[in-house]
Amino acid sequence: MNYLEIAGALIGLLYLWFEYRASIWLWPVSVIMPAIYIVVYYQVGLYADSVISIYYLLAGIYGWWMWLRHTPDKGEKPVSGTPSKLLLPMFVVLLVVFVLIGIILETCTDSTVPWWDSFTTALSIIAMWMLAHKYVEQWLAWLVVDAVSCGIYVYKDLYFTSFLYGLYAVIACFGYLKWKQLMNLSYERV
């Protein structure tokens, strides 16, 4: 039994609760959880997931800073939709990162799932950036990442983590609806 994996999964549930509520407390938790998963993923040969956990840790610091930089007179950064002008650049970044990581994993590692690992990693980079900017569609990106990751983790015998990501996928649906509601409320106040 991997106690580190269990600890990471439990902290992940706490993270999810804070994210669902659009609470700034998701950010400190988002620094702790990936620190644990760097080790867990490396142990089972999910190298891109291990590296993406380093990114998550750094993105957690960035997201925390982004959410904190709004002054009390301006209020908290509101939830908003992703500007359409960002969709093409985000897609290009997704494709480039996906191909680069996939090639590296296929040629330089013993990964048994290089392209799946690469896909979830590339999309996670985009989703985490969207979360830092409080774009509601980040939930849709996470839904795809979580569903694919759930299957990968079952394949890799990471059952607690697979359960966590299955739960993430379900809650991503509810999170999207909740954030849409928050976005609509902030538009009504304007």
Model-inferred region functions:
Residues 22-25, 37-52:
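Helix-loop junctions on the outward
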Residues 1-22, 26, 70-71, 80-190:
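Polytopic alpha-helical membrane-helix bundles and their juxtamembrane interface segments
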Residues 15, 48, 63-66, 160:
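Short, flexible micro-motifs
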Residues 7, 49-58, 165:
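Individual alpha-helical transmembrane segments in multi-pass integral membrane proteins
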Residues 28-31:
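Core catalytic region of metal-dependent phosphoesterases/phosphodiesterases
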Residues 33-42, 96-103:
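Membrane-embedded alpha-helical segments in integral membrane proteins
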